[in-house]
Amino acid sequence: MVYISNGQALDSRSQSPWRLSFITDFFWGIAEFVVLFFRTLLQQDVKKRRGYGGSSDSRYDDGRGPPGNPPRRMGRINHLRGPNPPPMAGGUGR
């Protein structure tokens, strides 16, 4: 990238890529990334413990949270009402 310094057009490629300011900026960039990464993980954990709501008019201010799903029923599916299966073949009933 070209920039102007003291009335002269200079190319930034003439500077060393390993100058001290680049190294320190790179270090602080990585440090901020790590801090923000763990901060977002902890914020999600806090939201889960609080019932995922920051408003004071929530119904679940005591920390209980919303009610969970009902337990799954095991066994045959009875809620599909359809025709009965045909009788088994073989016997004529005589």
From Swiss-Prot:
Localization of this protein: Endoplasmic reticulum membrane; Cell membrane
Transmembrane domains' residue ranges: 20-42
Gene Ontology CC terms, in alphabetical order: endoplasmic reticulum; endoplasmic reticulum membrane; Golgi apparatus; plasma membrane
Keyword Nuclease: no
Keyword vocabulary terms for this entry: Calcium, Calcium transport, Cell membrane, Endoplasmic reticulum, Ion transport, Membrane, Selenocysteine, Transmembrane, Transmembrane helix, Transport, Ubl conjugation
PTM: Cleaved by CAPN2/m-calpain in resting macrophages but not in activated macrophages. Macrophage activation up-regulates expression of the calpain inhibitor CAST/calpastatin, resulting in inhibition of CAPN2 activity. Truncated SELENOK proteins produced by failed UGA/Sec decoding are ubiquitinated by the CRL2(KLHDC2) complex, which recognizes the diglycine (Gly-Gly) at the C-terminus of truncated SELENOK proteins.
Topology in membrane: Single-pass membrane protein
Pfam families named among the record's database cross-references: SelK_SelG
One GO biological process term: protein palmitoylation
Region (Disordered): 48-94
Known function: Required for Ca(2+) flux in immune cells and plays a role in T-cell proliferation and in T-cell and neutrophil migration. Involved in endoplasmic reticulum-associated degradation (ERAD) of soluble glycosylated proteins. Required for palmitoylation and cell surface expression of CD36 and involved in macrophage uptake of low-density lipoprotein and in foam cell formation. Together with ZDHHC6, required for palmitoylation of ITPR1 in immune cells, leading to regulate ITPR1 stability and function. Plays a role in protection of cells from ER stress-induced apoptosis.
Quaternary state and interactors: Interacts with DERL1, DERL2, DERL3 and SELENOS. The SELENOK-SELENOS complex interacts with VCP. Interacts with ZDHHC6.
Name assigned to this protein: Selenoprotein K
Species this protein is from: Sus scrofa
Name of the gene encoding the protein in the UniProt record: SELENOK
